[in-house]
Design a protein with these regions (language model features):
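Bacterial N-terminal signal peptides
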Residues: 2-12
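A "functional boundary" signal
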Residues: 18-208
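Sec/Tat signal peptide C-region and signal peptidase I cleavage site
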Residues: 13-17
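Accessible peptide chain termini
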Residues: 1-2, 147
Length: 208
């Protein structure tokens, strides 16, 4: 039950910024956006790899580095959802992180690290590796004072501690995630879900 509850938590967090209306939110070129949607529809098919290369080049011509990062994330997502090629997941996590670092896009840097690499380890019950990566990510985000990265670290730490049945630590990290989101005015798109998750953690302890 506990693993299924936590797995539901992981699945409830799609790529933030892609699930909403990307075209309006980021003022994406209509042709580029239409092709992005075609790529998104093929994320479970090997063809998405070639399509993502095309999307990357189209975005480069438009000078849209954000969509270039999205194109690389599409490749990562293909292997992430296949869930059986850890070397490929690690490879594309590093590709996304490297491009995001070079183009000053920390959102995608920490997305690849937390929502893909660490969540993959969590799904594989490799909680000690996930914890190592989460603590390393927290340290880097704190050094950079990147609050969204810190919030992401609290998010995955909560999931890891939950699977380890360390519910007090899971609750503490979930509360810190909420606190930093509110204090620094971070993206509140999933905040109601986060509160629900906190309630679920309290229910596991028998507390209200």
């Amino acid at each position: 039950f506990i693993f299924l509850f936590c797995l539901g938590i992981l699945c409830s967090f799609p790529m933030q910024g892609q699930q909403r209306d990307t075209q309006k939110e980021y003022n994406v070129d209509s042709t580029l956006y239409a092709y992005y949607m075609r790529c998104k529809a093929e994320v479970s098919s090997p063809i998405v790899m070639q399509m993502s290369d095309t999307l990357f080049l189209m975005a480069e011509e438009q000078g849209d580095q954000r969509m270039q990062a999205v194109a690389l994330c599409n490749k990562l997502d293909y292997y992430y959802y296949k869930n059986n090629q850890p070397d490929s997941i690690n490879h594309y996590v590093e590709i996304v992180k490297d491009f995001a670092k070079k183009t000053n896009q920390p959102k995608y840097y920490y997305f690849a690290w937390s929502k893909r690499l660490i969540n993959y380890y969590i799904k594989q019950h490799q909680n000690n590796i996930a914890l190592y990566e989460a603590n390393k990510m927290m340290q880097e985000a704190e050094q950079e004072q990147y609050m969204d990265g810190i919030a992401n670290a609290y998010n995955v730490l909560s999931s890891i501690y939950q699977l380890k049945r360390l519910y007090s630590l899971a609750i503490d990290n979930k509360k810190k995630e909420i606190e930093i989101t509110l204090e620094y005015g971070l993206d509140k798109y999933n905040l109601s879900t986060t509160y629900s998750m906190l309630g679920g953690l309290y229910s596991l302890t028998g507390k209200t």
